[in-house]
Amino acid sequence: MRVPINTITPDTPSAEVIGWAHEIRDLGGLAFLLIRDRTGIIQVTVPKKKVAPEIAETIRAISRESVVRVTGTVKPEGKAPGGRELIPDAIEIVSLSATPLPLDVAEKVPAELDTRLDNRFLDARRPRVSAIFKIRNAVQHATRNFFFENGFIEINTSKIVAAATEGGTELFPIAYFEKEAFLNQSPQLYKQMMMAAGFEKVYEIGPIFRAEEHNTTKHLNEATSIDIEVSFTDHLGVMQTLEDLIRDIYQFVDKTCSDAIADLGLDDFAVPEKGFPRLPYSEAIEIASATCEEDIAYGDDIGTAAERAIGEEMGRLYFIVDWPSSIRPYYAMPYENDPEICKAFDMMHPRMELSSGAQRVHQHDLLVEQIAKKGLNPENFEFYLNPFRFGMPPHAGWGLGAERLVTTMLGLPNVREAVLFPRDRHRVVP
């Protein structure tokens, strides 16, 4: 019976493994075959004069990345991966790989990112790449555990909508019978509707779509968003929830993904310290204007260069708070004593924005006023506004980019590396 490679120790008497031929070295009278499965690598040592002739013939026929089955005796070997080797009694080629390979899974020959993404099924066999997705799996597992333990209800909202939920134009139109429809850019309005339904604490992990013509290392046109909405709290409450979640995720990854962390060479992986600094927008602009190459003034959005300048100053995860109402969405709650400022925030990594959120406007008339101030027609938002007429509780929430979280956590150079099959303005296959 086949066993995972990582369960085989130097003391294991015998084993059957099935995996991919990672490397093959034939030294004449002695051959070495490295077999890889998702749990690790084991060395198969073939002394040709001491094994059956058919085993030596099979070894010669194996091409790299073929799927092979090996049954044999395990022996301690200090120079081999894991301190053990497998001496074969039988070798079978289960599935022969074509040659040449589009890319080198053993990573001895570097490949461009486009080549890797074009051949993602091969690229994902590389231990460093599979480590990324093992950690991403742990991130999403930890996220669901955190929300379940804190009394949240998971929801799944529609990704086909009739209008722009955020009021913008960055939408992908789709053919939907005789109607006009779009791919949803955010579950924002649906989350708020569930506050009117009395769910009080909801979350969703799902795709969002943005028709933005970016071509950068941090933007995608299809991304995974982790969203929450909470009743009877304010922006400060959900900011604390966000900080607690981030630290919980890091702790879970640190505890459960040591092998993947090692595969990525992350010797400095560490859980962020408590108490993410809270930097007012006005102070963030002062930092950026003093050090940024681009001109920036109060009332401007914070672009890439400004993010970089502020991030270098802060040096850790932090919040930018108290944004001008003029540059935040219509549903962000303004301060009662200063309506020009709203209860909105971004959570930032020194490299990029990770999350955006706010306390929401819950009063129907104020929300209509806010929508109109943004130059939008409230009549186009009737399906959204209607719940606010029937007892909407105070509430707040945020959205967190899963890919950006993984990218910054692991120090990846490009957000596409954190997605199995990324979608950007140039890529729709595979």
Curated annotation (Swiss-Prot):
The residues annotated as site (Important for tRNA non-discrimination) are: P81
PROSITE patterns reported for this sequence: AA_TRNA_LIGASE_II
CDD domains named in the record: AsxRS_core
Here the disulfide bonds are none
**The protein, known as:** Aspartate--tRNA(Asp/Asn) ligase
Class of enzymatic activity (EC top level): ligase
Region described as Aspartate: 188-191
* Documented EC number(s): 6.1.1.23
- Report the domain of life of the source organism: Archaea
Cofactor: record remark:
Binds 3 Mg(2+) cations per subunit. The strongest magnesium site (Mg1) is bound to the beta- and gamma-phosphates of ATP and four water molecules complete its coordination sphere.
Quaternary structure annotation from Swiss-Prot or TrEMBL:
Homodimer.
Molecular function GO terms recorded: aspartate-tRNA ligase activity; aspartate-tRNA(Asn) ligase activity; ATP binding; magnesium ion binding; RNA binding
Where Mg(2+) 2 is bound, by residue? E353, S356
Q: Where does L-aspartate bind?
A: E166, R210, S356, R360
Q: Give the function comment from the record.
A: Aspartyl-tRNA synthetase with relaxed tRNA specificity since it is able to aspartylate not only its cognate tRNA(Asp) but also tRNA(Asn). Reaction proceeds in two steps: L-aspartate is first activated by ATP to form Asp-AMP and then transferred to the acceptor end of tRNA(Asp/Asn).
Q: List the GO biological process terms.
A: aspartyl-tRNA aminoacylation
Which organism does this record belong to? Methanospirillum hungatei JF-1 (strain ATCC 27890 / DSM 864 / NBRC 100397 / JF-1)
Cellular component aspect of the GO annotation: aminoacyl-tRNA synthetase multienzyme complex; cytosol
Binding of Mg(2+) 3 occurs at E353
Q: Which reaction does it catalyse?
A: tRNA(Asx) + L-aspartate + ATP = L-aspartyl-tRNA(Asx) + AMP + diphosphate
